[in-house]
Amino acid sequence: MNFSVIFAVGIGGFFGAISRFLIATWMQKITHSLFPVGTLTVNVLGSFIIGFLYMYFEQSINPIYKAMFITGFLGALTTFSTFSLETLLMIQDGLWIRAFLNILLNVILTISSTFAAIILFKKMYGGL
């Protein structure tokens, strides 16, 4: 493994984690919601960005940038573990509908967001 790639992943992860904290906290604060809208926001945003970057990086770009942005930044920005914990806590509190809605929204919106980004990229820059 190349040290430059490892370093790039670390740098991307640093900024992704900070971004996740700031975005999720801000979204939760402005919505005043009991629903974990902050986690949903970073997951949907990250899914959109990964769809766009997937298409961009297919156009042959330095693999260090791909590792930094996809593995590092987006790996730290999105958060399946927080989504899992929040859903489990809802279930434990008997909030079954909210838990189901959380699962449904995270799955449908993240996949749709990635798909939308790929379509947008193709419209903007042409397909592969």
From Swiss-Prot:
Its main location: membrane. Na(+) is not transported, but it plays an essential structural role and its presence is essential for fluoride channel function. One of its GO terms (molecular function) is fluoride channel activity. It catalyses: fluoride(in) = fluoride(out). It is a multi-pass membrane protein. It is found in: Cell inner membrane. The chain crosses the membrane at residues 3-23, 34-54, 69-89, 100-120. GO terms for cellular component: plasma membrane. GO terms for biological process: cellular detoxification of fluoride. Keywords: Cell inner membrane, Cell membrane, Ion channel, Ion transport, Membrane, Metal-binding, Sodium, Transmembrane, Transmembrane helix, Transport. The keyword ATP-binding does not apply. It holds the Pfam family CRCB. It comes from the Bacteria. Na(+) binds at G75, T78. HAMAP family: FluC. Fluoride-specific ion channel. Important for reducing fluoride concentration in the cell, thus reducing its toxicity. Belongs to the fluoride channel Fluc/FEX (TC 1.A.43) family. This is Fluoride-specific ion channel FluC. It comes from Nitratiruptor sp. (strain SB155-2).
